[in-house]
Amino acid sequence: AGANRDISKVIQSLPGVGGTVSFRNDLIVRGGGPSENRFYLEGIEIPNINHFSTQGASGGPVGILNVDFIKSADYYSSAFPSGRGNALSSVFDFKLIEGNKDKPSVRASVGASEISLSLNTPVTENSSLLFSVRRSYLQFLFSQIGLPFLPTFNDATTRYKVKLNKKNELSFLFIGAYDQFKLNFDAEQTE
């Protein structure tokens, strides 16, 4: 509750984890800096899990990861696994759900700041596809109320997994985000 479908807000409720001001998702673990955390998705390090991040921080106002696809999140505030070094404060290791093997599942949603479309479907008897795309609509709301900035964010997550045999599988993972600010020249100037 209160996380607005954002994994960083959920993480801030863990013991020893704090945050900064309410509009950002910076993670402060046991007094370390926000840039001292490491994030992994399916064993691959991702440099940031938030939109509109700033240099020297791990947070931004909105998360990149689609929570519909998160199966688990392992959290280490000390005694990091040997393959997860180079972190001073914490390590977060996210795992994705398994793709549907029987029938396609499509989900569309409207959140507090974005619209999204997710697809979880079998491709062949031995393969599956997870696909998600999101786009913000804040720029339209901010324009209507006359704010001087118009933020837009987009992100996509895709994983194609094929089972080669009983012991081997091959996965292709894509995660991407694009953020943009525009000035609202139609906004009234404040004094």
Regions found by a protein language model. Give the residues of each.
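Periplasmic N-terminal accessory/gating domains of Gram-negative outer-membrane beta-barrel systems
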Residues: 1-80, 91-97
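Transmembrane beta-strand segments of Gram-negative outer membrane beta-barrel proteins
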Residues: 68-75, 82, 87-91, 95-110, ...
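Short gly/pro/ser/thr-enriched loop/turn and capping motifs at secondary-structure boundaries
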Residues: 137-140
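Outer-membrane beta-barrel proteins
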Residues: 15, 61, 80, 105-107, ...
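Transmembrane beta-barrel wall of Gram-negative outer-membrane proteins
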Residues: 107, 111-135, 147-180
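Transmembrane beta-barrel outer-membrane domains
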Residues: 22, 87, 101, 108-112, ...
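A short, compositionally biased micro-patch
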Residues: 20-22, 32, 87, 111, ...
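Outer-membrane beta-barrel translocator domains and adjoining extracellular loop/strand segments
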Residues: 142-147, 177, 182-189
